[in-house]
Design a protein with these regions (language model features):
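Short amphipathic alpha-helical "interface-anchor" segments enriched in bulky aromatics
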Residues: 136-170, 175, 179, 183-188
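Short, conserved catalytic/metal-binding motifs centered on acidic residues
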Residues: 26-34, 51, 127, 149-156, ...
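Acidic, metal-coordinating catalytic cores used for nucleic-acid/nucleotide bond scission
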Residues: 29-37, 57-60
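A short acidic (Asp/Glu
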Residues: 37-43, 62-66
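A short, flexible helix-boundary coil/loop motif
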Residues: 186-235
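An anionic, glycine-rich sequence signature occurring as long contiguous blocks
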Residues: 50-158
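Active-site beta-loop-alpha junctions of metal-dependent nucleic acid enzymes
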Residues: 1-20
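Short, surface-exposed basic-aromatic patches at helix termini and helix-loop junctions that form
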Residues: 23, 41-50
Length: 235
């Protein structure tokens, strides 16, 4: 299913219920390029103060970026990149939005910048927003924080069984998800302490690495003395 399938009406229902039933004011909204459409942006803008949506690039837009001269060098995520802002007036009629553009040099496997006959080859990333006051670095940093939240779901899905829920009803599955979420917090505490004494493990090691060192034990059945003996390869 296309990521935009019923996304606009789903967002509209969720935001309306949050604001009307809970009395919550939605301050900021951020989403990836799957939400980059006129209908979704109009719905979001009406229901929150500021939004930050990854803009889809196209060939003509990248060519426009190459013509820009006023780039500022900043550090984002411990890496240097160039940033600038341009006004986007032709996306929705009567509306003017800010397009925050980030460019990073394309590098080969040895870390060397790639070039062509026109100079350094850049990778461009854009964020569409109605925030005209924050700096480009602040906007990019805030948008990138959504990746940390997605990683939490990746860990829960692959390490703690959320991708294969054990029950047929949501009530039971909700209990399972809450318990495994608490177990994940306990595991993070455990791995932080164990990693200080067990060298192969790190504070960021996933559950699979922990199982490999502490739970999984290689073994082999061997024939000796006219009987089968289970040989454990462990200390």
């Amino acid at each position: 299913t296309n990521v935009r399938f019923h996304q606009e009406d789903t967002l509209r229902r969720i935001m309306d219920r949050v604001t009307s039933e809970l009395g919550v004011v939605i301050e900021r909204f951020r989403a990836d390029c799957g939400s980059f459409s006129k209908e979704i942006i109009q719905t979001v803008e009406q229901r929150c103060n500021t939004f930050y949506i990854r803009a889809a690039n196209c060939g003509s837009r990248c060519e426009d970026f190459r013509q820009l001269k006023e780039w500022k060098s900043v550090e984002v995520g411990y890496e240097r990149c160039d940033v600038t802002s341009v006004s986007m007036d032709d996306f929705i009629e009567g509306k003017s939005y800010r397009l925050v553009v980030q460019r990073s040099p394309l590098k080969d496997k040895d870390g060397r910048e790639q070039t062509d006959m026109f100079g350094v080859i850049y990778t461009y990333r854009c964020i569409l927003t109605n925030n005209w006051t924050s700096t480009e670095k602040d906007i990019i940093t805030f948008y990138n924080e959504r990746g940390a939240s997605e990683k939490n779901f990746d860990i829960q899905n692959n390490d703690f069984g959320w991708s294969h829920l054990p029950f047929s009803f949501m009530a039971e599955n909700m209990v399972f998800m809450m318990v495994t979420a608490m177990l994940k917090n306990f595991y993070l505490y455990l791995i932080r302490n164990i990693s200080e004494k067990v060298k192969p493990l790190k504070k960021t090691s996933r559950l699979k690495a922990f199982i490999l060192h502490f739970v999984s034990v290689p073994a082999k059945w061997v024939r000796t003395g006219r009987q089968n003996v289970l040989n454990l390869y462990t200390n």
